[in-house]
């Protein structure tokens, strides 16, 4: 009996199995949204959930709690893993930061340029230039994990590092180009929460409850500031101490405790809530519009070309080195996966075009097709053409 339980636990904690579950939830969301349960699906996502303390009230749809709340925990975990790499891993050398930073920059500039070239002359459609610049880290990482031992672990760290810069870029784009109102008061409160965590860290305090309270205050203030709340998860991670005063692995303990919830609750729920695009309303005739073509070219072509080109240049001119144990073929495979814009691209699409059906949902279809093509081609390439010998 114990042997069976052990095997089940091993399967459940297997990252590749988690990736499969993520894809299943994506397909399930598409089926539900386009089936007889579509109304219940929308009611579930629009259900208001909230709380109030005195005059303060936070009452938002369930979808927001998933996208801005639960997914912040995902970015918190990414931040924890990156901190380990910065302090004890490859990124202890500042030179190793150059590659993911430049890769992310290429993954923003080239897709935006392609979209702009296709839609030049139309001021309204050009508002969507940032749609193909995004990468859905959760899905890209899930596909990468499904490749198993075919690629070195250093490429996983490269993708995570690239994703941080990519997300920061997306947040800056949203804040500068798609945010109409920013709250200075909320920024001040966020600064106080960050200062409190810095003091806790410097004093070597490892009470989880203290960091939890500060992180909640930070999350709420970032949410109210007008900036995407997921940034709070990344910031919080950087202030978690590596170990207790007794030398126990504090950060590692927190990271390990999150693995199960991330792989089998948070990320599947995130996929189910965001992948439900209504395909019945899509006008096939609009599929070949400038917006759709720009999005597809930006995500499927622009992302992989931009990320790989900028990566190759900094490696070629010796400003950076390839991730340890990898080669250019494997690096290119990871670059393909950055074209999975999916939920983040859908999010920016909603900000860029306030009228959701202005293009008869062809823009949403373009995001789905480009993301699926990037995921499928990236998986096939990494699994069969770039396998480690």
Swiss-Prot record:
It is a multi-pass membrane protein. GO terms for cellular component: plasma membrane. Keywords: Antiport, Cell inner membrane, Cell membrane, Ion transport, Membrane, Sodium, Sodium transport, Transmembrane, Transmembrane helix, Transport. One of its GO terms (molecular function) is sodium:proton antiporter activity. It is found in: Cell inner membrane. It comes from the Bacteria. It catalyses: Na(+)(in) + 2 H(+)(out) = Na(+)(out) + 2 H(+)(in). GO terms for biological process: regulation of pH. The chain crosses the membrane at residues 12-32, 62-82, 97-117, 128-148, 157-177, 184-204, 220-240, 260-280, 282-302, 305-325, 331-351, 365-385. The keyword Phosphoprotein does not apply. Na(+)/H(+) antiporter that extrudes sodium in exchange for external protons. Belongs to the NhaA Na(+)/H(+) (TC 2.A.33) antiporter family. NCBIfam families: NhaA, PRK09560.1, PRK09561.1. This is Na(+)/H(+) antiporter NhaA 1. It comes from Campylobacter jejuni subsp. doylei (strain ATCC BAA-1458 / RM4099 / 269.97).
């Amino acid at each position: 009996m114990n042997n069976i339980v052990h095997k089940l636990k091993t399967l459940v904690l297997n990252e590749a199995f988690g990736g499969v579950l993520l894809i299943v939830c994506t397909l399930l969301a598409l089926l539900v949204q386009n089936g007889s349960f579509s109304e219940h699906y929308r009611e579930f996502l629009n259900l208001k959930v909230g709380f109030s303390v005195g005059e303060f009230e936070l009452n938002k749809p369930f979808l927001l709690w998933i996208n801005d709340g639960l997914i912040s925990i995902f970015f918190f975990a990414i931040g924890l893993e990156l901190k380990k790499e910065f302090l004890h891993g490859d990124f202890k050398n500042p030179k190793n930061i150059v590659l993911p930073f430049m890769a992310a920059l290429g993954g923003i500039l080239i897709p935006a340029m392609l979209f702009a070239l296709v839609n030049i002359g139309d001021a309204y459609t050009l508002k969507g230039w940032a749609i193909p610049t995004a990468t859905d880290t959760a899905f890209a990482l899930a596909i990468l994990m499904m490749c198993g031992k075919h690629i070195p672990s250093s490429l996983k760290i490269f993708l995570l590092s690239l994703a941080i810069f990519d997300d920061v870029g997306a947040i800056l784009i949203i804040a500068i180009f798609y945010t109409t109102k920013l709250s200075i008061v909320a920024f001040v409160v966020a600064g106080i929460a960050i200062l409190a965590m810095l003091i806790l860290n410097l004093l070597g305090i490892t009470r989880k409850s203290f960091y939890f309270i500060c992180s909640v205050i930070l999350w709420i203030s970032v949410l109210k500031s007008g900036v995407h709340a997921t940034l709070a998860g990344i910031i919080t991670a950087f202030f978690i101490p590596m170990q207790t005063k007794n030398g126990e692995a504090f950060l590692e303990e927190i990271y390990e405790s999150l693995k199960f919830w991330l792989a089998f609750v948070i990320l599947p729920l995130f996929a189910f809530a965001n992948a439900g695009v209504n395909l019945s309303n899509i006008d096939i005739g609009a599929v070949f519009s400038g917006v759709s073509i720009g999005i597809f070219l930006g995500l499927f072509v622009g992302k992989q070309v931009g990320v790989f080109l900028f990566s190759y240049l900094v490696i070629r001119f010796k400003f950076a080195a390839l991730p340890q144990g990898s080669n250019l073929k494997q690096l290119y495979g990871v670059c393909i996966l950055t074209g999975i814009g999916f939920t983040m691209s859908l999010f920016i699409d909603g900000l860029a075009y306030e009228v959701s059906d202005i293009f008869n949902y062809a823009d949403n279809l373009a995001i789905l097709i480009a993301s699926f093509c990037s995921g499928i081609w990236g998986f096939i390439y990494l699994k069969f053409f770039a396998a480690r010998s």
